[in-house]
Amino acid sequence: MKVARFQKIPNGENETMIPVLTSKKASELPVSEVASILQADLQNGLNKCEVSHRRAFHGWNEFDISEDEPLWKKYISQFKNPLIMLLLASAVISVLMHQFDDAVSITVAILIVVTVAFVQEYRSEKSLEELSKLVPPECHCVREGKLEHTLARDLVPGDTVCLSVGDRVPADLRLFEAVDLSIDESSLTGETTPCSKVTAPQPAATNGDLASRSNIAFMGTLVRCGKAKGVVIGTGENSEFGEVFKMMQAEEAPKTPLQKSMDLLGKQLSFYSFGIIGIIMLVGWLLGKDILEMFTISVSLAVAAIPEGLPIVVTVTLALGVMRMVKKRAIVKKLPIVETLGCCNVICSDKTGTLTKNEMTVTHIFTSDGLHAEVTGVGYNQFGEVIVDGDVVHGFYNPAVSRIVEAGCVCNDAVIRNNTLMGKPTEGALIALAMKMGLDGLQQDYIRKAEYPFSSEQKWMAVKCVHRTQQDRPEICFMKGAYEQVIKYCTTYQSKGQTLTLTQQQRDVQQEKARMGSAGLRVLALASGPELGQLTFLGLVGIIDPPRTGVKEAVTTLIASGVSIKMITGDSQETAIAIASRLGLYSKTSQSVSGEEIDAMDVQQLSQIVPKVAVFYRASPRHKMKIIKSLQKNGSVVAMTGDGVNDAVALKAADIGVAMGQTGTDVCKEAADMILVDDDFQTIMSAIEEGKGIYNNIKNFVRFQLSTSIAALTLISLATLMNFPNPLNAMQILWINIIMDGPPAQSLGVEPVDKDVIRKPPRNWKDSILTKNLILKILVSSIIIVCGTLFVFWRELRDNVITPRDTTMTFTCFVFFDMFNALSSRSQTKSVFEIGLCSNKMFCYAVLGSIMGQLLVIYFPPLQKVFQTESLSILDLLFLLGLTSSVCIVAEIIKKVERSREKIQKHVSSTSSSFLEV
């Protein structure tokens, strides 16, 4: 491996080498050698001239998020949809055939579709920009011997940066000063435990992964404790953060299932359209008709058969779904993504910050005399209670518990202000515990005389203190740390107010510790006494990163609906399985796989075992990518949730990337398709429900539009091919076309989401939107409409002379069939009475408006002239209503039969299961 990468100044005379160190190499070298390679002055920093000089070659300390495309290009890109291309071709053919009405209506439809899609994507991008501007990155940097407060984007390799508690690390740093420094690297590595940092060089054999480089502070990570200085070794895309970003940009986002379905439908419609042209031309030629005339008729029919309203309904339905998701605090960046969630059958979720809060919390206390206390409440606040045997403990009411809380509070460097932690998460959990008991003031009651800071080697921390009001008394020593280390300094333990010699109790406590550990708790032992080596063992506290509120319920519902959830984390196997079990993700039959085991397998091997795996632990971004690829290889539609830099590449590779809006990094949000503004995992369940509902609405529209379209096409084709008089004139056909693509059709796209839809299994993305069942329903409706309309035409045409009354009856019959067909198309499974006749107000208004329009066409004299109609009697209208309602009645009967069949199948299935159990 090269020590450094050099870039040349493209100037003839003053060629200078500008070095860039990798974090792995920098961690192996002494600080002095790193400074020499970077040509850096660690104490005084760089001068402004040198900073400008280096920036000319390294660029700004930021990421090149793909250059903004001009708005006109973004608008033009919306025309790439196959259905839009087909409609454009239809418009051109309509112009060539002098059918200007069709050409105008199709062009307007196209413009509406692309404009709605363009505006929605533009608004989502702007929302994302505003979200990413909430926290402007700044840092403290030494330049020309002075400490400056500057923007992180100004940093260059060789700059000296100062870090303190609460700071975000602005670039990759090689540390040369560190005092009790702990950094939370969970956003980068997935590790929930803050990493203790040192300055000594590391052997090459021990720094293979990012988490093991203890002398490097990585860009984007958070200082939890201590202070430090470091020299910048990598900025922007040359940082480890940047490596993830480059991987993310290189990953292509897959097409959504809806896009695939619409592509397939576009191809099918094209195929059928050309088929119609060919068949009609062939039949006409065989009948001896003029070939050019037959071509004109067949092209007109093919253009009429293409449902130009489909892209509008799809776009508007998706846009309304996106707007509903915004109300639920979710930003969807691209329209089709919300529907994609409807066929999502696997969710790969990062644990830290997504399933859990990333806020360590004390949940159990075990005193040295065997008393067990449960602690409620989550996070760094005072909300919660300490309960012993059903009673709430407060203050010094229970001395055994209070002593443990006192030791944890005094032997502590963390501070909680306004529910925000300044310090280590584990120490924050102890302060929050003290707040719940009203004892957090104890931290200020003691004066610290000496301190033994925590280190990863000794695994304990101790302080020597005196009480402010009793400074003449001997010092008291408080200790906390790993049980096996703390117990070495203890000689006694407390039992019911008495101090006893530590004997068999040690083994009992060890067993208790093991039991707590098996539950995935991080265990801390606490002790106090006059001197180290003469301490009294007080007891244990169990700490956990708790699950987010409502996650367990959401997980249960999703699993019941056929969605598999897999937890991916950088934590240990024990902790990962404990959290997964609490959430209902892990059972006795589940498997867990480590990152090392994933490395030993290729994608093909992993794809064979991945369906049975519930937990992936010690996983890196590379492993997450492999997991997602193996799931996609099995044909799964994968959603990936996450909030850290380590999730970004997988978020982009997944079919749906879901980022957390509050805790998520900018890189993570850039990679995601959807952002949960409130970080609420339950919103994913709402999105899946929304996605399934949207797809159902699109199917409802397709059923209505194609059945009406096929009926109209068949009616006109039969009349043309069999030399019958045309039952409808041109203006009447235009009016039917307006209804077919107009308000009644559009209103089907805004049908309220059926609450039962979440219980249905995810649909197979390979299935066409035109399923066998849907095609059957379309054909049945079309046949009823054609037969009914032809019957009315035949009934009125008994004198073999076409009169305005004949066409008016036929025309009105077809329109009424249309309305009843739309009514039955509102749901594919439920009766219109079950979903509610007026539950979709827009549909009611649309149908009412269409009927009023039809009555005006029949009875309003000026329109009678335009449409060549005449007034009908009340009896005529009642006859037509009775006849045309048949399409709705038959559809309702089919639904009833299907529901009955489904109930019988469920009953047989449950009976078989019960029999097998017996």
From Swiss-Prot:
Residue intervals passing through the bilayer: 76-96, 99-119, 268-288, 303-323, 704-724, 733-753, 774-794, 843-863, 874-894
Domain of life of the organism encoding this protein: Eukaryota
GO cellular component: cis-Golgi network membrane; Golgi apparatus; Golgi cisterna membrane; Golgi membrane; trans-Golgi network
Pfam family, one: Cation_ATPase
Extracellular topological domain residue ranges: 97-98, 289-302, 725-732, 795-842, 895-918
Membrane topology, as annotated: Multi-pass membrane protein
Subcellular locations according to the entry: Golgi apparatus, trans-Golgi network membrane; Golgi apparatus, Golgi stack membrane
EC number of this enzyme: 7.2.2.10
Keyword Metal-binding: yes
Cited function: ATP-driven pump that supplies the Golgi apparatus with Ca(2+) and Mn(2+) ions, both essential cofactors for processing and trafficking of newly synthesized proteins in the secretory pathway. Within a catalytic cycle, acquires Ca(2+) or Mn(2+) ions on the cytoplasmic side of the membrane and delivers them to the lumenal side. The transfer of ions across the membrane is coupled to ATP hydrolysis and is associated with a transient phosphorylation that shifts the pump conformation from inward-facing to outward-facing state.
Name of this chain's protein: Calcium-transporting ATPase type 2C member 1
Native source organism of the sequence: Pongo abelii
